[in-house]
UniProtKB/Swiss-Prot annotation:
One of its GO terms (cellular component) is cytosol. The lineage of its organism: Archaea, Methanobacteriati, Methanobacteriota, Stenosarchaea group, Methanomicrobia. The active site is at D255 (proton donor). It holds the Pfam family PYNP_C. This is AMP phosphorylase. It comes from Methanosarcina acetivorans (strain ATCC 35395 / DSM 2834 / JCM 12185 / C2A). It is an enzyme of class 2 (transferase).
Amino acid sequence: MRLNLEHFDIKIGQHKVMFNVADAKELGVNPGDRVRIRGHQSISAIVDTTEDMVPPGTLGVFSEVYEHFEDWDKPVEVVPALRSKSSGVIKKMLDKKSVLQDEIKLLVNDIVEENLSDVELSAFITASYIHGMTDDEVEWLTRAMIDTGDTIEFDTHPVMDKHSIGGVPGNKISLLVVPIVAANGLLIPKTSSRAITGAGGTADLMEVLSPVEFSSEEVKEIAEKVGGALVWGGATNIAPADDKLIRVEYPLSIDPYYQMLASIMAKKGAIGAENVVMDIPIGPSTKVPTVQEGQKLARDLINLGHRLGMNVECAITYGSSPIGRRVGPCLEVREAMKVLESMEGPNSLIEKSAALAGILLEMGGAAPRDRGKELALETLRNGKALEKMKQIIEAQGGDPNIKSDDIQVGQYTADIYASTDGYVIEFDNKWIIEIARLAGAPNDKGAGVAIHKKMGEQVKKGDAILTIYAEKEFKLDLALTTAQRTNPIIVEGMLLKRIPGIYGFQ
């Protein structure tokens, strides 16, 4: 069947086309079936139907399909396509049967090529979430995710990297770790994510200082030139299957454990990382609530790294309260830059950054065992980390002379006050993050929260314990209402509650 194309200027995250019901009936296809579209290119797409959005003789195509045919001004040939063999692989996984390496390669390739529907992707995610995967299957999945995307081969070795499991607000340590490590002669090309559910991923933060979107070739050039990089991995086409899985996982609110392992390690493998430190924050509001779960995750990451030829060490870190006192892109970058400029900043930020950078310095041979943290702190104190950060900013197209005081935060502010005398006994990290997001972070770079009192600090009734920053007044109102309702910082006196006796006073 030959059909004219009509472009729907909408991105839906998959290859999908819209038939008029009459054309679909004539071709013998139903919603969810596949067709192959041939013009100057040939791709497969998933069928949907409509009675009136497109007329007979016309095929409605969304942006992901249209980009393959935007230079094609003739009708396209459309024929029914066979269901992908990956559907059978997914069924095997649902039936809790083992799968072969070639089957996983086929599955990942179909994910990248948009040959699977959201229903099929959801089934794959559900199967791995419920039944898990063997060590072999996780390794094969990781290798397939690496092989179906860009890879970078650096000329300088060893290649260092770090990753945080996340879940802790204010975790800006990469802005310190990368320049510390690079300043000591080690290569650390840090590809990072943007926030999905957080108030700012490392890429969102670095974007305050410089561009972060570069091709794989540009990342190599930048890192080789100055020893490090802080870039957004999404612009590199590294492990593209991961982004396609995340799109389906997000509305389901699940993150299958073994896919998480593969996702993390695929991104490290794609840049040729040889020594990797994993930050595993532990706490009730983090992704890893207990030390026991953290130890299991550490063992699994180390084992998978060994299978892939990577040396992986894990740091189980305190995650019950924010890192530093600022959450949100500009606020966090100001805090990190102050540490680089003068070592002024929260102890939690300095200590954690130095500890993780120290592990990398030891792994890379720049410091003797148990002396890495000392070297990391000295690199901050002597200004070498700041100088290296300026070089990275300049290499990525930013202003190397920018100072912490130059970074502007949201103009609209509101404070949350303590309702009683006492001490800070608890943080609800999830609500801290949500309040910062409601204020506009990470898209509004100046939005976020400033935390004035940390765990164990004394508070007087009426003290400001939290300040909300926003770039838009209506977002400030929304964040303030939520903060007042949820009470994300818990203050209690030494006397928590008085319980009277049976007879009371005589």
